[in-house]
Amino acid sequence: AGATWTLADHAYEATNSGIQIGASDLARELVGRIVGAAEQLKVKCVISPECGHAYTAIRWEGPNLMGRPFGFEVKHILEVLDDLRRAGKLKLKGTLDKPLTYHDPCQISRRGGVYEQPRTLLNQLAPQFREMTDSGVMNWCCGGGGGVSANERAEELRFTVFKRKKAQIEELGVKTMVTACANCRVVMEEALEHHHMDIEMLGLTELVAEHLDEGKPNE
């Protein structure tokens, strides 16, 4: 796509456990590593990976924790991919010829506002993309939000909450579900196994990668 990028060797972990447990000093330290690396490298944009809490930590909580605005943009990887696609710098080829649906991660969609970009990408890659009844900002949680995914004692709670998602999947009759949050993916993979559901889970970024056109992009 013609973009220059780098990966800081001392600020590569984006998930912020300090925010998850309410420890503001730790949260500030972890965000500070990323901000410090970004400023040292003089980057124009910091890209959050497929992790809802990482996106929240650096984009929305970060400036408050640091007490100042950033001199760089923060975007979710799906925002970047869709920006490149619209600019003609990222070309996709082929399609996934099977019915599938998309799970909107709470932190990315409901809180972050990133819900149009995944659909733009999916509509190009998956002609049989099907929306859940409640989607976008109204989509149901995977069952692992609010730190529940990290609590072993909350396993039954996760499986119970997932029943609503289970009903959504069964209503559509799909065998493949795509998402853009690693935490959601792990939680739902465990719940799918628990409920004996033969559903394939995919990350949208990996789906895009598998359909990249290696031809020369537009200048």
What does each model-identified segment do?
Residues 1-219:
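Iron-sulfur cluster-binding electron-transfer modules in prokaryotic oxidoreductases
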